Amino acid sequence: MTPARVVFICCVVLLAAAAAAASSSTAAGITRADFPPEFIFGAGSSAYQVEGAFAEDGRKPSIWDTFSHSGYSVDGATGDVTADQYHKYKEDVKLLQDMGVDAYRMSISWSRLIPDGRGAVNPKGLEYYNNLIDELLSHGIQPHVTIYHFDFPQALQDEYNGILSPRFVEDFTAYADVCFKNFGDRVKHWSTVNEPNIEPIGGYDQGILPPRRCSFPFGVLSCDNGNSTTEPYIVAHHLLLAHSSAVSLYREKYQATQGGQIGLTLLGWWYEPGTQDPEDVAAAARMNDFHIGWYMHPLVYGDYPPVMRKNVGSRLPSFTAEESKRVLESYDFVGFNHYVAIFVRADLSKLDQSLRDYMGDAAVKYDLPFLKSNNEFPLGLTSDFMTSTPWALKKMLNHLQEKYKNPIVMIHENGAAGQPDPSGGNTYDDDFRSQYLQDYIEATLQSIRNGSNVQGYFVWSFLDVFEYLFGYRLRFGLYGVDFASPERTRYQRHSARWYAGFLRGGELRPAAAALAGGGAYSQ
């Protein structure tokens, strides 16, 4: 390590310590009343991760059922039962009410509602989502509904290779129509798709997510088929066209009478330069264009970012004039799932390679903490990659404010994970999570005061759930779930008690005595 690097790291550590001290003092008096009156606080989950009942009442497999049953998640975990919300939704809604949230972010399982992906609607699936939505509303909780959250119907995957085919756009629009028609009288906040800027990379470049398509030498896992140099861009294009098609349908057919809002939800890593070398600064900006701008640029300006057009070339699909017009401003809000900052450096040599995937086109290199080796998780994944970097949230929101016309933003996911109690018991003490959430809620308020148009914040997650590749090794829940119990017993963690107190008017960072009992934190 060079002396300059040592000095740089020492400066970063000192600045971080000073920032933490300042944060503790400035946030002490913050309460919910400091946020705009209509600001929404909530918590979330998604269908495959929380529902269970994977083969009950007419539901058919999604690509995540196929993937997890093939053993690709840690410990061979699946979402077959998970937290069993399908059978316990009334209990869960009562917990949400007790916590005092304004809203619950949920998703609909396409293969539960329309088991074959198109055609007949499953009456039992329709009944379940009607019951859940009605239960939420009867307890004063707004349903914020995602139409597609990774769980694509396996039937359509088998029929035409799923999202890789343009046929997906028509089928998704028809599925969205069923959702709007049956639930839109009560659902006023719709997200079309969740994290469409990560599914193409994980599923069609690296092969670590379903449907496991990739090509040598880019796949993290070996894949039977795919093309990592082209398919991620095709899939992202189809997701964007499907989103805009569903938005057009909603606006033309439903919005005037139902009075709801519609958008989509992006993953919002923030890319930061690893050094202040101009090439590294440019690399971070380029990576933010490839990550956030991949969707925001078409939504705000009608086409992909110029740097993507330049670097990807003919492999990047083009919009027709009609498609560009439809994509442009096809949102009332944009959701962001934000957790961490990632540091990158330039690697312009990648642009000289004859074969390039997404990372090659971005021409950056980075050492993601979750690519460390010699750990217990598959694919080099570790549990410590979500360190607290609230400054990154502020930078991301400022970026949206300055570059993308300051859209209405809903922070749809933000949270911290812990591992299960090694003794086999239930982990109640999760003060690290409370601290993490306090940091990010304060950062959200600071961004609002700086002019960002943030209108909601949702903790990920309401309950412990099936965390995809991590299975049940990572627990994000405000409420824990005893997965060893057939009843999937819920239990309140310290963070749930703190969040409830804050939502009832308590201070963001209460004194220990306040948390011990009495007042807003008495639950």
Curated annotation (Swiss-Prot):
EC number in record: 3.2.1.21
Gene3D superfamilies the record matches: Glycosidases
Organism: Oryza sativa subsp. japonica (Rice)
Record bears the keyword Signal: yes
Record has Calcium as a keyword: no
Catalytic activity: Hydrolysis of terminal, non-reducing beta-D-glucosyl residues with release of beta-D-glucose
Residue sites binding a beta-D-glucoside per the record: 49, 149, 194-195, 339, 413, 460, 467-468, 476
SUPFAM superfamilies for this protein: (Trans)glycosidases
Family membership noted in the UniProt record: Belongs to the glycosyl hydrolase 1 family.
Top-rank taxon, per record: Eukaryota
Residues carrying covalently attached carbohydrate according to the record: 227, 450
Disulfide bonds: 214-223
Keywords carried by this UniProt record: Disulfide bond, Glycoprotein, Glycosidase, Hydrolase, Signal
Molecular function, one GO term: beta-glucosidase activity
Coiled coil: none
Signal sequence interval, chain numbering: 1-22
InterPro entries: Glyco_hydro_1 (IPR001360), Glyco_hydro_1_N_CS (IPR033132), Glycoside_hydrolase_SF (IPR017853)
Pfam families (UniProt xref): Glyco_hydro_1
GO biological process: carbohydrate metabolic process
Name of the protein in its database record: Beta-glucosidase 31
